Regions:
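Loop-rich non-cytosolic ectodomains and luminal regions
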Residues: 1-347
């Protein structure tokens, strides 16, 4: 854009006519030296380590009509919500080595917001959680200053649903955005010992194979928590034993690592299918997995794991079907929601 002069600090890359600015903030960590000492895997630049920033930036302003790749190629071409928008990125959170989460300091977040305003952005997208109780939180005040400067701020409500009064960023000068969803469900099921459990799946065809719980399929000395979660190389180290997993459907707990990472770990260990189970009430999701998979609710977890522990257990992941159930749109179950706790719960 005319008169745009924001910095571009990237690792082995440059800005272009889409990505027009890139800066990072780590003063509260002790600068580059502090990050290098505590997070040696991180990029000392605005480059994204764990892909969350890339994901949100492309959703907001990705180019129009880009052909999807990988399993999602069945969707054809995809676009961001504002494909003609320019993007300037401000990195103030620093990732764990596994990429499952990131953290930072309030002062760096405020510095990033202030810099975006000073650079002259029109919109700030802030897909990071925050306070649910305090209008005077430093980040909320930084957004008040942004709003006073004419900058529109969209901030995430958070992913702490379905519990009530969990919504973050309660301030009235922010547009706080919950997660919505549609009424198209790719329903799936799995049959164990003549009992069928229903969930979500994109399995194209039925698959029958021996069944094993991940907790019984670990490499010697594998961490029990990582084993229950089916950690793989993408999560910092594989824990499934190929000698035990090969040719089998594996039961994995939801949590910590990306759901698709779990099916990748199963594939890398020679498994042919996966049952992913919630450990607490949450959504079930039809993801593009690396092996045929079905996602079940936490209410089925105990029965599934108990059967998987029996000698000779087998499972049949049934072919998925498209269903239309709820009115749409509606709030996704994982999304944070009101009523607000800030300001005496007036909203």
């Amino acid at each position: 854009p005319k008169n745009w002069t924001a910095a571009c600090v990237l690792d082995n890359a440059t800005c272009n006519n889409k990505l027009i600015g890139a800066q990072y903030f780590n003063a509260a960590h002790g600068g580059d030296a502090g990050i290098a000492a505590t997070r040696p895997w991180e990029y000392l630049s605005a480059r994204d380590y764990n892909a969350h920033g890339t994901h949100t930036a492309s959703t907001a302003g990705g180019n129009f009509g880009v052909q999807a790749t990988g399993p999602a190629s069945v969707f054809g071409s995809i676009s961001g919500m504002a494909p003609h928008a320019y993007i300037s990125v401000y990195k103030a959170l620093w990732s764990t080595e596994t990429g499952d989460t990131a953290s930072g300091f309030t002062s760096d977040l405020v510095a990033a917001i202030d810099q975006a305003v000073a650079d002259g952005v029109d919109v700030i997208n802030y897909s990071i959680s925050g306070t649910s109780t305090n209008f005077l939180d430093p980040v909320e005040i930084a957004f008040l200053n942004a709003a006073d400067a004419g900058v529109f701020v969209a901030a995430s409500a958070g992913n702490s649903g379905p519990t009530t009064s969990t919504v973050a960023h309660p301030s009235p000068w922010i547009t706080t955005v919950a997660a919505g969803t549609h009424n198209r469900n790719s329903a799936g099921s799995v049959t164990l010992n003549a009992v069928t459990y229903s969930g979500a799946s994109l399995a194209a065809a039925a698959l029958t194979a021996p069944l094993i719980d991940s907790t019984a399929a670990g490499l010697p000395g594998a961490d029990p928590t990582a084993l229950a979660l089916c950690f793989g190389a993408a999560d910092g180290g594989a824990v499934l034993d190929p000698a035990l997993v090969a040719g089998k459907i594996v039961v994995c707990d939801r949590g910590v690592s990306a759901r698709v990472n779990k099916s990748l770990a199963v594939l890398e260990a020679g498994g042919v299918g996966m049952i992913i189970v919630n450990t607490s009430p949450n959504s079930v999701n039809a993801d593009f997995h690396y092996v045929p998979s079905v996602h079940l609710q936490n209410t089925d977890r105990a029965a599934v794991k108990a059967y998987a522990a029996t000698p000779g257990a087998t499972a049949t992941i049934n072919a998925s079907v498209l269903t239309f159930t709820d009115p749409a749109p509606f709030t996704a179950s994982f999304s944070s929601r009101g009523p607000l706790r800030a300001g005496g719960g007036d909203l």
